[in-house]
UniProtKB/Swiss-Prot annotation:
Positions in coiled-coil regions: 1-390
Region annotated Disordered, chain positions: 487-611
GO MF: kinetochore binding
Chain's role: Required for the localization of dynein and dynactin to the mitotic kintochore. Dynein is believed to control the initial lateral interaction between the kinetochore and spindle microtubules and to facilitate the subsequent formation of end-on kinetochore-microtubule attachments mediated by the NDC80 complex.
Cellular compartments per GO CC: nucleus; outer kinetochore; spindle pole
Biased composition, class Basic and acidic residues, residue ranges: 493-511, 570-583
Protein name: Protein Spindly-A
Lineage of origin: Eukaryota, Metazoa, Chordata, Craniata, Vertebrata
Organism: Xenopus laevis (African clawed frog)
Length: 611
């Protein structure tokens, strides 16, 4: 039940996907028609816009000439005002910079004095602290010495031995040495504190010097910018001087008829130049728009090819579903047969017991029983021989089916790799176009004008259930396996001939299957590039022998793990139906003009020719 539900669910999903595919095709046709209409409207609007823009540019040019004549009268006054303003501005900026420099200088001097006073204050505090510590230490030492003198004076009056006196003297000497060492340690600590203080002052001085260095760098940058501004002003003045010299040498002021005629021709040529510029800009915008559309279309084609490579073939899925359903039915039949055999075995086990009781009553019929046993043994031996032959034929059929499945699996894997490589190739082309558009736009335009390529979208073709039919995809895959580096597109007839030869060699090396090449004929036009279709077919003699063996095996046993006879008959029927469908579709294509469809699901037929 669960398997049937899954099969129904998958069929429903397949039907929905086919409906979506048909809808997408209709929508694509509508979009193409609307795009052509919009393209025509855009062309008309562009022509109108170019005409209006040209008229407006001519009017603009005439008005500009009038405005220039009027502006020349105002330029002298504005130039004088601007010069005065610039002079005042420069003076003000110089004063501000001078005041800022003086302020920074005074501020730095005050900071230096403050740092020096802080350092002197820290040194005075440290020296005061050290003197206090020394004073405390000297008072302690004085108290200890006075105490020792008092103790010595008391002990002098007492009677002591010479040893005690020597020990006492040694003790005093050691204490004096200890006091000297402590004093040295304190002096070293004082020295360390002074060094730390001087280190801190030096670090502060270093920071101050770094800040001064940064300020000097900023001042140098300011001076450099001022120098650049002065250079720019000098260049402007030089340009104004050149303009003034040209105006002084203007032939219009002389009133010569030849120069006036030349001026009229120049104005007319400028008008023509304006019109040509307007047309060039409009054509350039149109070219950029079409290039963006082509780039977007290439990106979409790359994504579609990648989706084709990632998705699976619906006809292959249907065939696998049919095989799964057939194997499930075979398993059910085998289970029923096993149950029947178990029941018959139980009956046969119960039968001999009853027969033995009858034999006790009928001892005279033992001869007939032995005869029947001998016949039964002979028939069982013949049955075992037939079963051995049947198992051998089954193994052969299983090996053949496994070989066919392996070849189909390899073919579909190669087709998938081909689609992925085509998607990657299209992405690389898109990235190459982007890089050329980014770094070499002029070269890109020249290449497009010199060499044009026509890319054809992959069309949908029905596939056989028994043979995986692939078009130029398998051709390019065989070429890739044979040469390890060539692409799926051929730019000349020689390349196509070489690809055909490589394809024939590669298909002969892969499997002993026949290759059927069927070119597609188109009405009303030159014949296009031939599309090849590789089909795996079994040999007729092998198929007939296999059908005979399978019919014989099916007569012996009702069901088997590999019912090859039913598969062969069903596959032959499907093959005939597919051949009839192809003939009808070929007739319909010859009658009606071909329509370009963009498939929403992957197909085994892919082609990327370049013309």
């Amino acid at each position: 039940m669960e398997e049937s539900e899954t099969v129904l669910k998958l069929r429903r999903q397949l039907k929905e996907a086919e409906e979506e595919r048909v809808k997408a095709a209709h929508y694509g046709l509508e979009l193409l028609e609307s795009q052509s209409d919009l393209q025509n409207q855009l062309e008309e609007q562009r022509n109108e816009m170019t005409g209006t823009i040209e008229n407006l540019e001519q009017e603009k040019y005439s008005l500009q000439r009038e405005v220039e004549l009027k502006n020349r009268m105002l330029e002298s006054v504005t130039s004088e005002c601007e010069n005065i303003r610039q002079q005042q501005k420069l003076i003000l900026e110089q004063l501000q910079e001078q005041l800022e420099r003086n302020h920074h200088r005074e501020l730095g001097e005050i900071k230096d004095k403050l740092e020096k006073l802080k350092a002197e204050l820290d040194e005075a505090r440290l020296s005061e602290k050290q003197l206090k510590h020394k004073l405390e230490y000297q008072t302690e030492v004085l108290a200890n010495k006075s105490e020792e003198l008092r103790m010595m004076s008391e002990r002098v009056h007492e009677t002591m031995s010479s040893e005690m006196l020597t020990l006492q003297l040694e003790k005093t000497e050691l204490e004096s040495a200890k006091a000297n060492l402590e004093q040295e340690v304190n002096e070293l600590q004082y020295r360390e504190q002074q060094l730390l203080l001087t280190n801190g002052t030096q670090s502060r001085k270093l920071e101050h010097l770094q800040t001064e260095k940064e300020e000097r760098e900023k001042e140098s940058v300011g001076y450099f910018s001022a120098l650049e501004k002065a250079r720019e002003a000098n260049q402007d003045l030089q340009a104004q001087l050149d303009i003034a010299l040209q105006q002084a040498q203007d032939p219009n002021s002389k009133g010569n008829s030849l120069f006036s005629e030349v001026e009229d021709r120049r104005a007319e040529m400028e008008r023509q130049l304006i019109s040509m510029k307007v047309q060039f800009q409009s054509l350039q915008k149109q070219h950029a728009f079409s290039r963006q559309q082509m780039h977007r279309m290439k990106v979409q084609i790359a994504t579609l090819l990648q989706m084709k490579g990632s998705q699976s073939d619906p006809e292959q899925l249907e065939r696998l579903q049919a095989m799964v359903a057939q194997k499930n039915s075979e398993i059910e039949a085998l289970v029923m047969k096993v149950r029947q055999l178990e029941k018959s075995q139980q009956v046969s086990e119960n039968g001999p017991a009853v027969g033995s009781s009858d034999n006790l009553g009928q001892g005279d019929e033992t001869y007939y029983v032995d005869l029947l046993k001998m016949k039964l043994l002979n028939s069982s031996k013949e049955n075992e021989k037939i079963k051995d032959e049947l198992s051998l034929q089954r193994m052969k059929a299983l090996a053949e089916s496994q070989r066919v499945l392996e070849l189909e699996r390899k073919l579909f894997a190669n087709d998938r790799h081909l689609k992925l490589s085509q998607g990657e190739n299209m992405k690389l082309r898109v990235s190459l176009d982007e890089i050329k558009m980014k770094y070499e736009p002029d070269e890109m335009g020249k290449i497009h004008t010199q060499k044009r390529r026509k890319e054809q979208l992959p069309l949908d073709f029905p596939m056989d259930n028994t043979s995986a039919a692939v078009t130029s995809g398998t051709e390019a895959q065989g070429l890739y396996d044979a040469t390890a580096g060539e692409t799926c597109t051929a730019e000349s007839t020689d390349g196509r001939i070489h690809s055909k030869e490589d394809l024939s060699l590669s298909t002969k090396e892969q499997d002993p299957s026949s290759v059927a090449v069927k070119p597609k004929e188109l009405p009303n036009g030159p014949p296009p590039k031939e599309r090849k279709r590789v089909r795996i077919m079994e040999d007729e003699n092998n198929a007939q022998d296999l059908n005979k063996r399978n019919t014989h095996n099916c007569s012996v046993t009702s069901a088997s793990p590999r019912s090859t006879s039913e598969d062969a008959t069903s596959e032959s029927k499907r093959f005939d139906e597919e051949q009839e469908k192809r003939k009808q579709e070929r007739k319909s294509r010859l009658r009606a003009p071909p329509v370009l469809h963009v498939p929403s699901k992957p197909n085994a037929t892919t082609q990327c020719p370049q013309q």
